Amino acid sequence: MVDIVECPVCKNTDLQKFYHCEDYTVSHETFHVKQCAQCSLAITTPRPETEHLAKYYQSDEYISHSGKSSGGVGFVYKLARSFSLTWKRARITNFRTSGSILDFGCGTGEFLNTMRLSNWNITGIEPSPEARLKAEILNSIKIYASLDELTDQKFDIITAWHVIEHVPDLLQTIQKLKSHLNKGGIIFIAVPNYQSPDAQQYREQWAGFDVPRHLWHFSKTSMNSLLMSVGLKLVDTIPMKLDAYYVSMLSEKYKNKNKMDLSCLIKGFISGLRSNFLARKKINYSSLIYLAKTDEV
């Protein structure tokens, strides 16, 4: 195990006990989550060594990599993903109607395919060999395994949909992504928000913690601190309202001894409604998309 003793964002060493969370998906091990007393970044620590992280993704329940779904939550996930592909494209075309796009952590490639069909020049990065192969078949292009495989390519838009929380080298990854951004380009970073109403409701059983796959856990404050630390400027924050329903249903499953039934779906739906209602004033939704650009004039 690797013990993180310093916040990578603000370099503060005062990491305070926050939650003890179970890995409900694969190992059923318990992991500690600590919170930086200065910037509020929450950190899974101790965490598995980087070379051992892959085994914690080896489950058909990890839908974004397996492409498989079963049961009520799997159905909800697939339904939400189908809608979100078009929704994400619309968010991007608010800024540009065409150009080059890098999807960092592209999974099985559905979002890239959506952008390809809209005449965008697409590039994808995906570390999972199985997901990468599916993305290559779907899009008929080479998908890179890591950022290090890119040379001096630059992009008008870079997207990281629920992936930054997975990377071991947080600061270095954001710095590398910034280096591949064209002048005037925008990076879209989507992550769970551990200060959302549904996170406050479910606490250590909140599915958004997803330890140990999620190594970092963000609040709006900590994400803004991260962006500023690498010279990126936050230009907008967009809620992902559907996430509250899916995450709440999973959280209800965890409360129900990891068994999904109709009551979990109903309670999760109600919790999602409640979370979205309470999140309105402060834009404190279950998941948020942060739009950032370089602060260079």
Give a label for each model feature.
Residues 8-16, 220-239, 266-267:
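A SAM-dependent methyltransferase catalytic signature shared across enzymes that methylate proteins
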Residues 1-71:
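N-terminal juxtadomain amphipathic helix
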Residues 3-5, 83-203, 215-229, 287-294:
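Conserved SAM-binding loop
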Residues 30, 207-220:
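Acceptor-substrate binding/catalytic loop of class I
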Residues 1-5, 18-25, 236-297:
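A C-terminal cap/extension of S-adenosyl-L-methionine-dependent methyltransferases
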Residues 50-96, 114:
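Conserved class I S-adenosyl-L-methionine
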Residues 70-73, 202-210, 250-257:
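Short glycine/proline- and charge-enriched loop/turn segments
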Residues 32-33, 137-141, 204-205, 249-253:
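Short low-complexity, flexible loop/linker segments enriched in glycine and/or proline
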